[in-house]
Amino acid sequence: GLFGEAYTDPMLEAYTTLGYFAGLTEKAYLGVLVTGVIYRHPAVLLKMVNTLDVLSGGRAYLGIGAAWYEAEAIGYGIPYPSTTDRFEQLEDNLRLAKALWASDETAFEGKHFSAPAITNNPRPLSQPHPRLMVGGTGPKKTLRMVAQYADACNIGEWVGAENMQKALDALKEHCAALGRDYDTVEKTSLSTVHLTGNDTVDSTLRRIKELSAMGFTHAIFNMPDVYKIT
């Protein structure tokens, strides 16, 4: 896997786990980086996020992406469409989220999904809706969808500083083309920190400062060995 794990390694289903965390926490925001669009029916996914938002008192966000782990999908018997189809499914999900969260009920017609009457009751508590975060660096499709639909982007540090900057530049161009204020998009990064390995608090702080200088406003770290810290 991307973070060194195979899909066969022990892991919990994300949204079930987040529902548990909603009852244990009071301030933490709860979401997935990121939800692959192929794994859940779009209307069911939005119902899950709405439910999480209500149960957590308005602390849910929807992190979403076009999915990439073909072996996992095949292993679970889930169809793994072409890249074009997955990105079209991503846009269907984003369009549906914007439409459903703006009303109590909506009909939807997309390229890969349609439904005559999807209800949004109870409404999410987040105002105006749970935050939408799109993960990825694709300059033509992904970042255009960020500019058009999302509240935040998420860019992995593993692509390197130069490509991270290129992604932000592409996002800025899409915002200009769509008439959106670039500053209204939250720029988030994702990386892994091993505080029991080669990483230190000081080196991590230096990375955060470098990300801030590039224009990122929120640094998110995966800490797989945090339980080893004593």
Regions found by a protein language model. Give the residues of each.
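Active-site-adjacent structural elements that line small-molecule/cofactor binding pockets in enzymes
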Residues: 1-230
